[in-house]
Amino acid sequence: MTQALTPTVSNTAQPDPARLLAPIVRQVGQAIGDYRMIEQGDRVMVCLSGGKDSYTLLDVLLHLQKKAPIDFEVVAVNLDQGQPGFPKDVLPRYLTALGVRHDILTEDTYSVVKEKTPEGKTTCSLCSRLRRGILYQHAREIGATKIALGHHREDILETLFMNMFFGARLKAMPPKLQSDDGTNVVIRPLAYVAEADIIRYAQAREFPVIPCNLCGAQPNLQRKVVGDMLEGWEREHPGRLNNILRSLTRVTPSHLLDRELYDFASLSVTPAQGDTGFDAESFPEREFMAGLSELSLLQ
């Protein structure tokens, strides 16, 4: 979810963008290594929306391009969707000054979305579907081997809870996947990065952020509600969002209810393994005590 940047007024010196970028680069490098997102000779198409996340992603990949032990290309691509008032000169000017290869595509999907979306319904699903199709096609045309999107930690967790709350499915947003058309590999290098870190970096870099007239004009989006919930959790219990994210990497199918993931029907007693079904859960002491305090179970 692209959050608007709120200018801050301070008497202190402006933060050094390089210092703010360093931890983001480390986390992105970790994610790339963990999921083998970028390999030798890749041509990475970075989808640049004009929001803080994709600007940050482009900066990080350009930085890694100079430092990484492998060679890969970066191509920035923006899709002008015909939104009224869209500043057509901002991104070409910015990308030219940056010296990065870039393509600006023009397709009036805005009119299609406004025409096809019933009153009171959100435009996100149709808009993203149309946008994906155009970007996938362009990736094939330029020979891109990877398509990089700017989704960060909060985007992944919002999707997890959206699917749980409204779709009754345990499903998040993968860091790497095969695209809908089966011909592209999509990667999310910012998967480990907190949105707050991106906001601080984007403010320090003073990116020319372009708001989305479709997304930003829709009140009461369920994703916004879920995002506020996560923000509240992290504010009251720092580290909780990282723990939730880590839990997605440490799944125990035998302790869930999905019969497709675990063969409960064929389960039999295996004395050598023992029965841990009724054993106490094992948590790190700090998290365990904090959880007990929160649940008022220390009585």
UniProtKB/Swiss-Prot annotation:
Record-level GO BP terms: tRNA thio-modification
Binding, [4Fe-4S] cluster: C124, C127, C215
SUBUNIT field: Homodimer.
Protein name in the entry: tRNA-cytidine(32) 2-sulfurtransferase
InterPro entries the UniProt entry points to: Rossmann-like_a/b/a_fold (IPR014729), TilS/TtcA_N (IPR011063), tRNA_Cyd_32_2_STrfase (IPR012089), tRNA_thiolation_TtcA_Ctu1 (IPR035107)
Name of the gene this protein is made from: ttcA
Annotated source species: Deinococcus radiodurans (strain ATCC 13939 / DSM 20539 / JCM 16871 / CCUG 27074 / LMG 4051 / NBRC 15346 / NCIMB 9279 / VKM B-1422 / R1)
Upper classification of the organism: Bacteria, Thermotogati, Deinococcota, Deinococci, Deinococcales
Cofactors named for this entry: Mg(2+); [4Fe-4S] cluster
Protein purpose: Catalyzes the ATP-dependent 2-thiolation of cytidine in position 32 of tRNA, to form 2-thiocytidine (s(2)C32). The sulfur atoms are provided by the cysteine/cysteine desulfurase (IscS) system.
Signal sequence interval, chain numbering: none
